[in-house]
Swiss-Prot record:
Pathway: Amino-acid biosynthesis; L-tryptophan biosynthesis; L-tryptophan from chorismate: step 5/5. GO terms for cellular component: cytosol. Belongs to the TrpA family. This is Tryptophan synthase alpha chain. Its EC number is 4.2.1.20. The keyword Cell wall biogenesis/degradation does not apply.
């Protein structure tokens, strides 16, 4: 069992969903990114998704896009992220996932990417713009290092496509709550319950719900049989930090 799955199963055994904050590398700025990540780790994060800044983040809403733009202008890049993770390996209790777009990973080279990610204590990757049909080379490189390539599914993902993902997926399944870009939303979209149920019928892996979560009450809007094993929150956290509040305060809402 991949460590990411272990983290989620342990949280569920304790009677709660696992908590997965998303933090763009270099946000709020280079000086405070790592202390903020450690604060998330110390205050209940089971897994932390680190966003790799990219110039054309097609799946991200304005909050994450702006965080990415600022990080890039501050000189944050994939090579530096991996190097700093290697320097801090073993300090973070949470599972670590890199979430980013294909181009920087492709330019870095899959074999070296997987090796350097393993040296940095990374347990999984999420690549929103990587088609399943083209995922083989990256999946094989990551698998050699014991790193999961986490599948994404959404309202438009067919049962056949889910079955393909289920054959090779590891760690957890990222369930996209709505089609479109990331960002806070007031209510959980009506189709989420259907998507969750369909995914639950196909996958044995834990299901993590993301894209738009703002507060714990949104999970309670879902029927019990459609609630996720883990909650991913990105834009809500970035907005909270941008307003000058602490990661500790944000995590306290979800406990």
């Amino acid at each position: 069992m991949n460590l990411l799955e272990e983290k989620i199963r342990a949280a569920n055994a304790a009677g709660r969903p696992a908590l997965i904050p998303f933090l763009t590398a270099g946000f709020p700025d280079r000086a405070t990114f790592w202390p903020t990540l450690m604060e998330l780790d110390e205050n209940g994060a089971d897994i932390i998704e680190i966003g790799v800044p990219f110039s054309d983040p097609v799946a991200d809403g304005p909050v994450v896009e702006e965080a990415s733009r600022r990080a890039l202008s501050d000189g944050v890049n994939l090579r530096g992220i991996l190097a700093e993770l290697a320097q801090r390996k073993g300090l973070v209790k949470a599972g670590l996932v890199l979430m980013g777009y294909l181009n920087p990973f492709l330019q870095y080279g899959y074999e070296k990417l997987a090796q350097d990610a393993a040296r940095g204590g990374v347990h999984g990757f999420i690549v929103p713009d990587l088609p399943h049909e083209e995922s083989g080379p990256l999946h094989r490189a990551l698998k050699k290092e014991g790193i999961a390539l986490i599948p994404l599914v959404g309202p438009n993902t067919s049962a056949e496509r889910m079955a393909l993902y289920a054959e090779e997926g590891e760690g957890y399944v990222y369930v996209v709550s709505v089609m479109g870009i990331t960002g806070e939303r007031g209510d959980v979209a009506p189709q989420v319950a259907d998507t969750m149920r369909r995914a639950r019928s196909v996958f044995s892996l834990p299901l993590a719900l993301g894209f738009g979560l703002r507060e714990p009450g949104q999970l309670r809007e879902l029927p019990p049989d459609a609630r996720p094993d883990a909650a991913v929150f990105g834009s809500a956290l970035l907005n909270h930090l941008e307003e000058g509040h602490s990661a500790e305060e944000f995590m306290a809402r979800w406990k």
